[in-house]
Amino acid sequence: MSRIGYKVIELPAGVEVSQAGEVVTVKGPKGTLTRNIASDITMTVEGNEVKFTRPSDDYKMKALHGTTRANVNNMVEGVTKGFTKNLQLVGVGYRAQLQGKKLVLSVGYSHPVEFATPENLTVEVPDNTHINISGIGKQAVGDFAAEVRAVRSPEPYKGKGIRYVDEYVRRKEGKTGK
């Protein structure tokens, strides 16, 4: 089932991967990431390659094998390139702005919605209808972007709301009169 787990991770120049028990640490030009991995999965670092092996072929081990490899690969990609999510505000009067370390959204509520920017992320507002969230942790970037989007997710009739730039919003037709 899991063929992803058997793929070898090639380490780019300047990236180090180390393991202490169940904790994997990846150091690279953009920073350092640590993560716990499953104790049953064995990770070996040989030169500039990282390989993963599993003890058995039961369903749970196959799932953990592929997931562990994907998580470590995302860590390697994060410390070399980083991850970015771009959001777009669609709607009359919908605006975003940065006030110090806070992201402030005006999205049709009676009050502005404020978010404290997490320490490990960079939030940019190039214009008042776009938000760029970037960082080295794929999960942290995705979680914060989803949290911002959940404030006013796109509705299907007019498409108003906060959406990812590459997201397709399925539209519905309104009621027809008699």
Curated annotation (Swiss-Prot):
It holds the Pfam family Ribosomal_L6. The keyword Ribosomal protein applies. The keyword rRNA-binding applies. Keywords: Ribonucleoprotein, Ribosomal protein, RNA-binding, rRNA-binding. InterPro entries: Ribosomal_uL6-like, Ribosomal_uL6-like_a/b-dom_sf, Ribosomal_uL6_a/b-dom, Ribosomal_uL6_bac-type, Ribosomal_uL6_CS. GO terms for cellular component: cytosolic large ribosomal subunit. One of its GO terms (molecular function) is structural constituent of ribosome. GO terms for biological process: cytoplasmic translation. Part of the 50S ribosomal subunit. HAMAP family: Ribosomal_uL6_B. This protein binds to the 23S rRNA, and is important in its secondary structure. It is located near the subunit interface in the base of the L7/L12 stalk, and near the tRNA binding site of the peptidyltransferase center. Belongs to the universal ribosomal protein uL6 family. This is Large ribosomal subunit protein uL6. The gene is rplF.
